[in-house]
Amino acid sequence: MKFIKTSTGDSYSNAFLSSFAEDTRIGHGIASQEDARLLQEDLKQVYLWAEQNNMRFNSIKFELLRYGKNSNLKDSTEYVSNTGEIINAKESVKDLGVTMSSNANFKEHIGKVIDTVKELTAWILRSFRSRSPILMMQLWKSIVIPRLDYCSQLWNPHYVGQIQELEQLQRYFVKRIAGYQDMDYHTALKRLGLYSLQRRRERYQVIYLWSIIEGKVPNIPATNNTDLIKVHTSIESRNGRTIYIQPLKTGRYQTLRFNSLPFHGARLFNAMSKNVRNATQLSKDAFKNILDMSLKLIPDTPLLCSTT
């Protein structure tokens, strides 16, 4: 079933709705029992829409993911499916290929990415005798890199251990290329024309935020029905275009937010050179070229494990 009802109608003013392919999502920030009631009302409106269009949701596939530290509110609120069954909350949910956990980190997803890349790397090394740089780079870029890049703007880790573990995947592969076995990792990356994986993830964050402020992709919605990504200073200003960074208090969840795309990505964007930040009315490929020229001037020194 494909959900094609837009979220701009009055019937769904309490929550946000989104749809992709056969998946439909409905969400609401819950701060009280009244918020929970409003979310259930919006769920009923979605069920009613499906019934009026001779369609129905599969209640078996309903998934509920809760974020936040208010355990009392979590335990005292329930939501029901179109069949009247209680929707059970889950510790993690896979959405469009990304595993999201109720503790608001991506440890489980990163672990799955690492396991998948290790399997693909082992398959490549078993299946191909040649270790020539050209062949190995074609295999790495076409088979493995897409798994490491997919949605990395969202799950980009900030824990040193996770950054090192991910970087070790590429380091291991580079060491298996003919002529690069004993070469320093950073030197090998330059000769092979590769970025470190950490640099790749940061690069994609900058590209995505540029796409948002250029209007090429939708903005990130905030809880007060406003856009989360906002331009702080314009191109005409002395320092060039920058993104506004909201102040945050200390705490566990604030730390996670501090390292998320709207905050960490915004700091990266603001740290770029003025010609990168002021690039406008360009194609994405043209912006990537400008960004890459600027990144060449910044040392690419990722965190590495001590073992090979």
Give the residues covered by each predicted segment.
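Active-site palm subdomain of RNA-directed nucleic acid polymerases
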Residues: 1-27
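Short linear motifs embedded in intrinsically disordered, charge-biased segments
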Residues: 160-308
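Hydrophobic alpha-helical membrane-association signature
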Residues: 1-3, 39-42, 113, 120, ...
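Conserved, non-catalytic sequence blocks in retroelement Pol enzymes and Pol-derived host proteins
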Residues: 31-39, 104-113, 127-138, 156-166, ...
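Mobile genetic element proteins and their domesticated derivatives, centered on retroelements
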Residues: 22-24, 50, 64, 97, ...
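Basic, alpha-helical interaction scaffolds
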Residues: 84-154
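Catalytic palm subdomain of template-directed nucleic-acid polymerases
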Residues: 24-51, 157
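Short, conserved micro-motifs composed of acidic
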Residues: 41, 56-92
